[in-house]
């Protein structure tokens, strides 16, 4: 029997997986019906997964192998998909695994800063106990510092924020330090400059880039598969496909309130322990919004997200 080796999945393209070993060997692998996984209820393999594989004869210049085991994931970035034939059932799609932090790439303009998207990612990061770094690109377009108005509410929440410009290089070194010696998953809508930033950080043109659609104002997707890249000086970044609608797996109408962290200090003062903070009398959260202790835009974001969640 051939020797079993271990490595980390650095790229997923369809049913093909690139696994990199500790000594830098890259092996193109596939799974088989007997592949063992420590993770149930989701796709078998994702970028960032630690796996065991068995080398096999290759007819190409690249080594090939068969994945025999997928180790248990310590963290995962999940997108939830509904099963078409029975919409009451859901299947988790793990986009990346075993990350140290989630990095949300936004932009000041083209497309404009989207606070509702930021709030969705904050909820997800809080639910998964993952640090979230908010990166605002294209600050070269913000000559008057207008983005600070959008960011003030997040600074009050002690969010990690980094302002950068892929165009003139501002903030890139600061961002590099925030990524050093960590496995960071880059996510966000297409068109914000995610691929351009990764190319700058990695030091070569690894990824295609695209402009924002003039018709919709939304990004044109250029990332179609996840991939992990090593950073000079330490650390890894994982590029993930643009997510137009980020689905919050595991978040319900009943538990959403616990992930708006500014609500927590007021919740014990509500008249009803199951208060949804919408219409109930004696709601301390609503009172805090009225007094200005909780930002109204965050509360309105909560209501909108609550309404979007299934009953």
UniProtKB/Swiss-Prot annotation:
It is found in: Cytoplasm. PROSITE patterns: ENGC_GTPASE (PS50936), G_CP (PS51721). One of its GO terms (molecular function) is GTP binding. Keywords: Cytoplasm, GTP-binding, Hydrolase, Metal-binding, Nucleotide-binding, Ribosome biogenesis, RNA-binding, rRNA-binding, Zinc. It comes from Chlorobaculum tepidum (strain ATCC 49652 / DSM 12025 / NBRC 103806 / TLS) (Chlorobium tepidum). GO terms for cellular component: cytoplasm. The keyword Cytoplasm applies. Its cofactor is Zn(2+). One of several proteins that assist in the late maturation steps of the functional core of the 30S ribosomal subunit. Helps release RbfA from mature subunits. May play a role in the assembly of ribosomal proteins into the subunit. Circularly permuted GTPase that catalyzes slow GTP hydrolysis, GTPase activity is stimulated by the 30S ribosomal subunit. Gene3D superfamilies: Nucleic acid-binding proteins, P-loop containing nucleotide triphosphate hydrolases, Probable gtpase engc, domain 3. Monomer. Associates with 30S ribosomal subunit, binds 16S rRNA. This is Small ribosomal subunit biogenesis GTPase RsgA. GTP binds at residues 137-140, 188-196. Residues 88-246 form the CP-type G domain.
């Amino acid at each position: 029997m051939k020797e079993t080796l271990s490595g980390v999945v650095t790229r997923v393209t369809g049913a093909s997986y690139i696994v990199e070993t500790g000594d830098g060997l890259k092996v193109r692998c596939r799974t088989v019906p007997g592949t063992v996984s420590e993770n149930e209820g989701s796709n078998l393999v994702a970028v960032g997964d630690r796996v065991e594989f068995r080398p096999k004869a290759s007819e190409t210049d690249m080594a090939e192998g068969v994945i025999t085991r997928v180790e248990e994931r310590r963290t995962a970035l999940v997108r939830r998909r509904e099963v078409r034939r029975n919409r009451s059932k859901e299947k988790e799609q793990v986009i990346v695994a075993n990350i140290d932090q989630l990095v949300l790439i936004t932009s000041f303009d083209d497309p404009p800063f989207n606070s509702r998207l930021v709030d969705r990612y904050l909820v997800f990061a809080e639910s998964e106990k993952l640090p979230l770094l908010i990166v605002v690109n294209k600050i070269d377009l913000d000559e008057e510092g207008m983005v600070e108005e959008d960011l003030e509410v997040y600074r009050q929440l002690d969010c990690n924020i980094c302002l950068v410009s892929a165009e003139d290089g501002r903030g890139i070194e600061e961002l590099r330090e925030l990524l050093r010696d960590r496995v960071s998953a880059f996510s966000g809508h297409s068109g914000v400059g995610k691929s351009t930033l990764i190319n700058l950080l990695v030091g070569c043109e690894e990824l295609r880039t695209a402009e924002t659609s003039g018709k919709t104002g939304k990004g044109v997707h250029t990332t179609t598969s996840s991939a992990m890249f090593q950073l000079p000086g330490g650390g890894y970044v994982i590029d993930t496909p643009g997510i137009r609608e980020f689905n919050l797996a595991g978040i319900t109408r009943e538990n959403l309130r616990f992930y708006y962290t500014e609500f927590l200090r007021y919740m014990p003062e509500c008249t009803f322990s199951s208060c949804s903070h919408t219409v109930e009398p004696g709601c301390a959260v609503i009172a805090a919004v009225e007094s200005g202790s909780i930002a109204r835009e965050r509360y309105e974001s909560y209501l909108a997200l609550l309404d979007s969640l299934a009953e």
